Amino acid sequence: MSQKIFGPCVCIGGMPGIGSVGKVAADYIAAALESITFQLMVSTGFPPEVPVEDGLARALQVELKAPEGRDDLIILCGDAQPLKPPHMYNLAGEILKVLASYEVTDLVTLAAYVGTSEDTVYGVATDPDLALALEGGGVTLLP
């Protein structure tokens, strides 16, 4: 029997970064699970850009999505990250408030890590029990 790592409602999030790996992965998960957007968030700290799709412009945003009929998973997909640390901090706080209102117990963020050429999954945890659980699942903890 495998050890349960996460609580009853988990958020998996990805935003652009190194190679947009986190964003691409989160977008893929959301599409594969046929997720529906249920909340949008914006930040005044996003880059001064406007995405255009099919001739329609919109603001950069963070989308919260959920697979239809499920209440145990939220997928966070972001168009961009704020440019300055104060804006990053504020957006992170707003995201955490919204996720708490949906009773999210765990947040897993996806990103790339530049360091080795090996195919390895790296992770960090916020408490020792989670660190042990991640290691037990084959995740290499960053030093």
Regions found by a protein language model. Give the residues of each.
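Ordered, amphipathic secondary-structure segments that act as subunit-interaction surfaces
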Residues: 69-102, 106-109
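Residue-level detector of short coil/turn "hinge" positions at structural boundaries
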Residues: 36-37, 106, 141
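N-terminal short beta-loop-beta anion/metal-coordinating cradle
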Residues: 1-80
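Short, glycine/charged-enriched secondary-structure capping and boundary segments
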Residues: 25-27, 90, 121-124
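Catalytic cores of processing enzymes, dominated by hydrolases/peptidases
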Residues: 115-143
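Generic secondary-structure signature for well-ordered alpha-helical cores
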Residues: 31-35, 100, 139
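Low-complexity, flexible helical/coil segments
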Residues: 45-52, 109-115, 140-143
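Gly/Ser/Thr-rich loops at beta-strand to alpha-helix junctions
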Residues: 15-21, 82-85, 112-118
